Amino acid sequence: MAKMYYDSDASLELLQGKTIAVMGYGSQGHAQAQNLKDSGLNVVIGLRADSRRWKQAEAAGLKVATVAEAAAQADLIQILLPDERQASVYEKEIKPHLTAGKCLVFSHGFNIHFGQIVPPADVDVFMVAPKSPGHLVRRTYEEGAGVPGLIAVHQDASGRAYDLALAYAKGIGCTRAGVLETTFKEETETDLFGEQAVLCGGVSELIRAGFDTLVEAGYQPESAYFECLHELKLIVDLIYEGGISRMRYSISDTAEYGDMMIGKRIITDETRKEMKKVLAEIQDGTFAKNWLLENQINRPSFNAIERKDAEHPIEKVGAELRAMMPFIKKPGE
């Protein structure tokens, strides 16, 4: 059974008197930094000098400096930049200030696991990964709760890396809900697989395929949108609350029979074989190599596919229907 840790297992005293530099002020950066600050810890945000987020961070009452300046004054350096930018920023602006006894912190293991960042042996390297988007990390903290998270230690130079990881997790509110001990390898590979095969890649293609099937058969696009996209949230909420069995308990017997009889015709043995290939490409570094190369050549495939998918009919129909639904929050609200 995996080991879980809670508030009683962690002490913020380990971080008292230390400076925590949070590099980046995006979804996770703003949430983790504000939670750490509200936990009574000393936080500085590291940003580019021309970053549009500089004033946002200052408005939230946070100290802001350039990445290099923040790294120089920090005892713990949390890198919350996009995966594809981390290695370059680390080499140029963080590594020169990563002196013995400091801690390097991550919320995703990509760059450590795939060898893009190789820290010196005399620093602690650990991960605290909230299993939630940043806005929920912040909101639940403010409500007195928290979101679950993962912790892992890659390098324990001080002999206290696990305790420091737990303290950091407590500072952002994750130990209120519980944190699971894992490894950089496990977090990285399972996270990428979940995104590609299920949560993002799998779901996106399933939705579009269902929509296309109905529209090509002559059904109204609006009806296809409701059946294949809009109602997905209702089903996912049930699964989130109590697993697949809870969802099946809550739907009609007709829907449950269709689930049991037809599901395996959609996710076939061939699909499962392809999932194993996807996982193998993550494990052997093929995906990481392709993604890093894609960024080095200015993302030609990424940009082309993004533009093409944005023009899919489901996007236009969805925008029109959502405009009629005042109960749906608009982006940015």
From Swiss-Prot:
<dbReference type="Pfam" id="PF07991">
    <property type="entry name" value="KARI_N"/>
</dbReference>
<keyword id="KW-0479">Metal-binding</keyword>
<feature type="binding site">
    <location>
        <position position="48"/>
    </location>
    <ligand>
        <name>NADP(+)</name>
    </ligand>
</feature>
<dbReference type="Pfam" id="PF01450">
    <property type="entry name" value="KARI_C"/>
</dbReference>
<keyword id="KW-0028">Amino-acid biosynthesis</keyword>
<feature type="binding site">
    <location>
        <begin position="25"/>
        <end position="28"/>
    </location>
    <ligand>
        <name>NADP(+)</name>
    </ligand>
</feature>
<dbReference type="GO" id="GO:0005829">
    <property type="term" value="C:cytosol"/>
</dbReference>
<comment type="similarity">
    <text>Belongs to the ketol-acid reductoisomerase family.</text>
</comment>
<dbReference type="InterPro" id="IPR014359">
    <property type="entry name" value="KARI_prok"/>
</dbReference>
<dbReference type="InterPro" id="IPR008927">
    <property type="entry name" value="6-PGluconate_DH-like_C_sf"/>
</dbReference>
<feature type="domain" description="KARI C-terminal knotted">
    <location>
        <begin position="183"/>
        <end position="328"/>
    </location>
</feature>
<dbReference type="GO" id="GO:0009097">
    <property type="term" value="P:isoleucine biosynthetic process"/>
</dbReference>
<dbReference type="InterPro" id="IPR000506">
    <property type="entry name" value="KARI_C"/>
</dbReference>
<keyword id="KW-0460">Magnesium</keyword>
<dbReference type="GO" id="GO:0009099">
    <property type="term" value="P:L-valine biosynthetic process"/>
</dbReference>
<dbReference type="InterPro" id="IPR013116">
    <property type="entry name" value="KARI_N"/>
</dbReference>
<dbReference type="GO" id="GO:0000287">
    <property type="term" value="F:magnesium ion binding"/>
</dbReference>
<keyword id="KW-0100">Branched-chain amino acid biosynthesis</keyword>
<feature type="binding site">
    <location>
        <position position="51"/>
    </location>
    <ligand>
        <name>NADP(+)</name>
    </ligand>
</feature>
<comment type="pathway">
    <text>Amino-acid biosynthesis; L-valine biosynthesis; L-valine from pyruvate: step 2/4.</text>
</comment>
<feature type="binding site">
    <location>
        <position position="252"/>
    </location>
    <ligand>
        <name>substrate</name>
    </ligand>
</feature>
<dbReference type="GO" id="GO:0004455">
    <property type="term" value="F:ketol-acid reductoisomerase activity"/>
</dbReference>
<feature type="binding site">
    <location>
        <position position="195"/>
    </location>
    <ligand>
        <name>Mg(2+) 1</name>
    </ligand>
</feature>
<feature type="binding site">
    <location>
        <begin position="83"/>
        <end position="86"/>
    </location>
    <ligand>
        <name>NADP(+)</name>
    </ligand>
</feature>
<keyword id="KW-0521">NADP</keyword>
<feature type="binding site">
    <location>
        <position position="227"/>
    </location>
    <ligand>
        <name>Mg(2+) 2</name>
    </ligand>
</feature>
<dbReference type="GO" id="GO:0050661">
    <property type="term" value="F:NADP binding"/>
</dbReference>
<feature type="binding site">
    <location>
        <position position="191"/>
    </location>
    <ligand>
        <name>Mg(2+) 2</name>
    </ligand>
</feature>
<dbReference type="InterPro" id="IPR036291">
    <property type="entry name" value="NAD(P)-bd_dom_sf"/>
</dbReference>
<feature type="binding site">
    <location>
        <position position="191"/>
    </location>
    <ligand>
        <name>Mg(2+) 1</name>
    </ligand>
</feature>
<feature type="domain" description="KARI N-terminal Rossmann">
    <location>
        <begin position="2"/>
        <end position="182"/>
    </location>
</feature>
<feature type="binding site">
    <location>
        <position position="134"/>
    </location>
    <ligand>
        <name>NADP(+)</name>
    </ligand>
</feature>
<dbReference type="InterPro" id="IPR013023">
    <property type="entry name" value="KARI"/>
</dbReference>
<feature type="active site">
    <location>
        <position position="108"/>
    </location>
</feature>
<protein>
    <recommendedName>
        <fullName>Ketol-acid reductoisomerase (NADP(+))</fullName>
        <ecNumber>1.1.1.86</ecNumber>
    </recommendedName>
</protein>
<comment type="pathway">
    <text>Amino-acid biosynthesis; L-isoleucine biosynthesis; L-isoleucine from 2-oxobutanoate: step 2/4.</text>
</comment>
<feature type="binding site">
    <location>
        <position position="231"/>
    </location>
    <ligand>
        <name>Mg(2+) 2</name>
    </ligand>
</feature>
<keyword id="KW-0560">Oxidoreductase</keyword>
<comment type="function">
    <text>Involved in the biosynthesis of branched-chain amino acids (BCAA). Catalyzes an alkyl-migration followed by a ketol-acid reduction of (S)-2-acetolactate (S2AL) to yield (R)-2,3-dihydroxy-isovalerate. In the isomerase reaction, S2AL is rearranged via a Mg-dependent methyl migration to produce 3-hydroxy-3-methyl-2-ketobutyrate (HMKB). In the reductase reaction, this 2-ketoacid undergoes a metal-dependent reduction by NADPH to yield (R)-2,3-dihydroxy-isovalerate.</text>
</comment>
